[in-house]
Every structure is written in structure tokens, then in C-alpha cells.
Amino acid sequence: MARRAASRAVGALRSDGSIQGRGGRAGGSGAEDARHVFDELLRRGRGASIYGLNRALADVARDSPAAAVSRYNRMARAGADEVTPDLCTYGILIGCCCRAGRLDLGFAALGNVIKKGFRVDAIAFTPLLKGLCADKRTSDAMDIVLRRMTELGCIPNVFSYNILLKGLCDENRSQEALELLHMMADDRGGGSPPDVVSYTTVINGFFKEGDSDKAYSTYHEMLDRGILPDVVTYNSIIAALCKAQAMDKAMEVLNTMVKNGVMPDCMTYNSILHGYCSSGQPKEAIGFLKKMRSDGVEPDVVTYSLLMDYLCKNGRCMEARKIFDSMTKRGLKPEITTYGTLLQGYATKGALVEMHGLLDLMVRNGIHPDHYVFSILICAYAKQGKVDQAMLVFSKMRQQGLNPNAVTYGAVIGILCKSGRVEDAMLYFEQMIDEGLSPGNIVYNSLIHGLCTCNKWERAEELILEMLDRGICLNTIFFNSIIDSHCKEGRVIESEKLFELMVRIGVKPNVITYNTLINGYCLAGKMDEAMKLLSGMVSVGLKPNTVTYSTLINGYCKISRMEDALVLFKEMESSGVSPDIITYNIILQGLFQTRRTAAAKELYVRITESGTQIELSTYNIILHGLCKNKLTDDALQMFQNLCLMDLKLEARTFNIMIDALLKVGRNDEAKDLFVAFSSNGLVPNYWTYRLMAENIIGQGLLEELDQLFLSMEDNGCTVDSGMLNFIVRELLQRGEITRAGTYLSMIDEKHFSLEASTASLFIDLLSGGKYQEYYRFLPEKYKSFIESLSC
């Protein structure tokens, strides 16, 4: 009899195991299998082991906390005669309640555990502590750990304390976290000393709050206690240093990390790459990418995306595309954000052909455009003035089942307003509201700007009143933005009307409003009106500032009324408003433009004696002014002095001197300066190459021109349509048809257009048949074009 009972028990266990084997991990069919296993075991009642039920319940909980709670309730209803939940069962239940955001039910379940006489351990409290901290109730969690757990005879462990530390740091209470850490270390933590996670959490908390000193202090305290940092600790420190662009220190920490036997991971390298990019050191970033590979750490999508983002934001899309291609060759699949980065880069540069090529590739790879990508396309067309194409993209978006969001509508409304199609913009505005989307200030700004531009003042005022009815705050900043846009477009009359409307509805103009309007009149050369605004500003109790006076002085300088500018400059100082370096720059420029070089030199001496920090822009103005007034030797002397100063020069400084030296025939000195770019840590820019190209062509050194062009591309300086057209014109004028044909091909390859002056010269020189023997050297489309003219 006993043997038969034992046999039945063994059979039950085997059967139980076979059922459990059909379970699995969460997700897909595994989760479904776990549900079936639990249901089958529960039907057995006494024949099922609690271990098997708990295992199945845990698998169900991973996929669906609600489904797990439902099955627990069935288990509880079955009663103690069938199967009795144990502490593990309750632990799963508490975890499910907390994950579902029902802390109240989680605490109720814990109360049931205590009521049933179970001895609870620290693990049972873990999900409740996490839930409280996630709800920003860390103080309640601390009360449980520091008081209630001990009252129940439960000793908190290091995991309990680490949850509190993270909760405090997430609430920007890192100082309290540090005090708790010290309590743990001083043996007041119930025998749970801090570990590497404890210290890393607090260090990271201080970094997030911007308190680097306390973060480093905690790091050194950690080392003093003999706790070795892990990769997460080092990553926190390196990421913070890179964010502060302290790249030398970040590299020191990296070297220490490796020396201590902690191997950097992809996140470590990504932080340093991001640091190099954000601090404008792309060469170092690319060099570090190579080091990353040589160290055996494979770059991920984030790594490549960081570099691409930097390059695209700096207009270096060709280099970004090379990195993109390198990424795909290595088998990494770009995400939609990666495509979006490069698409945005192409859109910003107006490279629509490349943009569409990448978009096609993206779709072929199974990634469909989202709202962000469609917005990029719409804005790209808008920038090129191709409104119809932008609207076609908007229609395609709807066809693909994507409902436009507020950002997309904002882009479309903005485009239509800028192109004068305000009525169409209003239709989309109404459609947007009908679809339940709330227009923000940007949308209203576009519409009001568009209506004002079209002289639809009544409708603009209606829209402003509508905004007030909708409870949208119409403050000074909102009006300043629209007034500024109109002023920059030369619509100062419209700006004045907006100013009057602003006052009429009770929004008070501030100093910025007056400065903006004054700038509008100055840009239009209407200095009398600008000066009236200055008087009006003072009459309402607003005090003109440095920007006010600098704007007016600049206005006078622009129309060569230098005496008036100097009178206002004296008035500025007598009013107690101190000039800044921008004010001085304006006056220096005005003096040089009116050939008052002696006065400019005197002002420079005065600036240096006043203790004002002189910027490189000031030196550039002086160098340019001296050169324009044929004082090249004086300029060269100042330039040489600048090279000896602790001042980082820029390409513009070199360009000013190269241009001046070339114009007075000092070609060798100009070439020496061109070569000196690299020794000063600089790269020649577009204007440098254009200056050198003009000189080389002028001297007939055409072989050097080709070499210069190659070095330009090697240095990552992108040639544009203007430069290629210029080179073609110069070569055509010299009768260098063969070489001109080479550069014409480049214009075609880059999808640029011939400028009118280039096309006119081309026709004049070649349509008469004078250079017939050179036809074969021209790109095919130009041959047929010339032949059609000859007929």
C-alpha cells in the first residue's frame, strides 16, 4: 500500500515536471504555455507542487502582471485543501501589484503575509520599495527600511539601501543619499555595508545635480574604503567629464580604468566620442573610433550616430555619409533616428537629390518614414521654396496612415505663410483644430506673421483675440518674436502696427521690443524714426541699454553719418551706459570705412587702456580696416603680434592677410601664410581656397589649381556651386576649354546649375565655332547645347 502511494507520488512529480517543461520564458508562445501549465497544475489540486505553480506563475507575471494576479485569485479561492500559497507566491503577487502601479494592493498582500504568520525577509519588501521610489515617495520608503522592517524582525540588506539611494538621487537629494551611505558604512545600516553599486549611485547623483566636487570626493572615499570601481562607476565619471568637455581628465580616468583591470565597454567609448564631438574635435573623435576597434570593442549604432550627428550639424554631410556606409558594411542596421540625422543634414544643406537617395534606401531596408522624417522632408522643400512638393509629401504622409501631429501641421502652416498662401494656411489651421490638435505659439506666430505680411490686419487681430479666448498667454516675448521677424524682412511698417496692437490689448513693450523696432528702422536707413523711438522709450520710463545705443550707432555708421554716430557715442557714455566690445567694433568699422584710420588707431589704444577684453573679432576688424586702407605693413605687424599672443586665431584672420598680400603682389608671403594654417591648428575654409584659386588662375599656374582643388577635398572643405562656376568662368576667359570641361563635369556630378554669367560666357565663346577643336573635351550635354545654338 505504501509502495503504491510512493509510486503515485513519483508519478505526480514526473507529470508535474513534464508540464513545467512546456513552460518557458515570457513573451510570445512561452507566456501562453506558462498560462496553460498553471491552469493544468491548479486543476490537479493536491497533486500539484507549490514549486511548480510558483514557477508557472512567475513566467505568467513576466508577460502580464494582471494575468498573474487573476491566477493567484483562482489559486486562493481553491482553498487550503487544494493548494496553499507560500512566501514565494506572495512575493510574486506583491511584485505584480507594484509593477501594475497598485502599491495599495501590494501592501495589502504584504499585510496578508504577516497575518498568516510568515517570516518576511528583505526580498519581500524590494518591489514595494522600488514602487514607492518610482512614485517619488522615497521618504516613505526610508521609513519602511529604517523603522518598520526592523520592527517586524526583518533586517534590510544592501539591495534595500541601494533602492533608497537611487530614489534619493532621482529626487535630487544626493546629499541625503550621501548621509545614508555614511550610515551604512558606519555599521548603523544593520550590517549592510555599502557596495560598488551604492557608491556609484551617489556619485552619479551628484554629477546629475552638477556637483562635481562632491562626486569626486565620494569617488575617493570609495577608493579609501577599498571598494574597487566597476565599469558603471567609471562610465558615470567619464560621461560627466565629457559633458563638461574636460577631455584631458576623461582620458586620464580611462587610462586609470584600464590600469585597474576594468575594461571599457561601448558606453565608455561613446561618452568620449560624444565629448570630442561636442567640444569640436572631430579628428580626435574619428581617431578614437579607430582606437575603439583596435581595443576589440565593436562600435554600435549609437557610436556611428554620434559622429554623424556632429558632422551633419557642421555641414559635413559627405563625411557623415561615409561613416553611415561604413556602419552598414559592418553589418549594423541603422535605426530610423540614424537615417533622420543624415536626412536632416542633407535637408539643411539643400542636397535634395542625396536626401531622396537616402530616403529610398531607408524604405528598401524596411523602415518607413515617421512624423519626424516627414517633417524633415517638408521643411527641406520649404527651404528651397518648393511648396507644392512639400504639400505632396504631406499628402503621402496621410496615405501611409500617419495622422499629422502638431509639429507637422506647424511645418506646413509655416511654409504656406512664408510663400504668401495664407488662406491655404488658415484651412490647415482649422483642419488641425478639427482633429483635436492644439496649435502652439509657433503656429499662431506663423499665421499672424503671414496675415500681417499680406496686410490682413483685421484677421490678424481676430486671431490674436482668439488666442486670448483660448487662454493662450500673449506676452511681450510672443510679440517681440513677430516684430523681430518683420524687421529682419524689412517690413518695419508692419512691425510698427504690431507694436500699436500690442499696446492696445494691454501687453507692455519692454526694452527688447524697442530695441527690435529701432533695429528695424536702422536696417531700413530711417534714422530719424529710430531716434524718435529712443525718445519714446525714455518717455515711458524705460532706460536704453548698450544694445539700444550700439544699434543706433551702427545705423548711422551704415549710412556713413559718422559724426552723428560719434555724437551718440558720447551721449551714451554721459548717460552712464558703458560701451561693450560690440559697440567699439561698430565704431572701429565705421572709422575705417570712412578712411579715418588715425581716429581708429586712437580708439584702439583707448580700448586697450580701458581694460575691455578685446576679442578676436575686434582684431579682425582692425586688420581688415588697415588692409583696405592700404596699410598692409601695419596689418602684418599686428598679425605677427597676434601670433605671439595667447589667442586662438581663426581662418578669417588668415584670410584677411592672405587677401591683402595677394592684392599687393606679395604672393610668396601669402603662400607662406596658407601653409601656416596647419601649424596653427587650423584648416583652410572655402574663402581661403577661393582667394588662392583666383591668384593661381591669374598667374596661369593651372597645374597648381588642380592640386589646390584636391587638397581642398582632402581637408573636408566642400566645394559649392559658386566656386565651381567662378573657376569655369576664369578658365573660359583664358581659353582653357579642356580644363573648363573638367570643372563643368564636376558641376554636373554635384547636381549644381550653371550660373547665368557662366552660361552667357560659355555661349559667347563657343557658339561661334572659335573653339570647335575642344568640343570633344566637353561633357555630352554641353556639346549638344552648343550644336543647337550653331544651327
Swiss-Prot record:
Q: Which UniProt keywords apply?
A: Mitochondrion, Repeat, Transit peptide
What is the first-listed, main subcellular location in coarse terms? Answer: mitochondrion
Q: Where in the cell is it found?
A: Mitochondrion
- Comp. bias intervals (Gly residues): 20-30
Q: What does the organism's lineage look like at the top?
A: Eukaryota, Viridiplantae, Streptophyta, Embryophyta, Tracheophyta
Query: Which parts of the chain are PPR repeats?
Result: 86-120, 121-156, 157-194, 195-229, 230-264, 265-299, 300-334, 335-369, 370-404, 405-439, 440-474, 475-509, 510-544, 545-579, 580-614, 615-649, 650-684, 685-719, 720-754
Origin species: Oryza sativa subsp. indica
Its Gene Ontology cellular component terms are: mitochondrion
- PROSITE patterns registered for this protein in UniProt: PPR
What protein am I looking at?
Protein Rf1, mitochondrial
Q: Which top-level group of life is the source organism from? A: Eukaryota
- Known role: Reduces the expression of the cytoplasmic male sterility (CMS)-associated mitochondrial gene ORF79, encoding a cytotoxic peptide. Can restore male fertility by blocking ORF79 production via endonucleolytic cleavage of dicistronic ATP6/ORF79 mRNA. Promotes the editing of ATP6 mRNAs independently of its cleavage function.
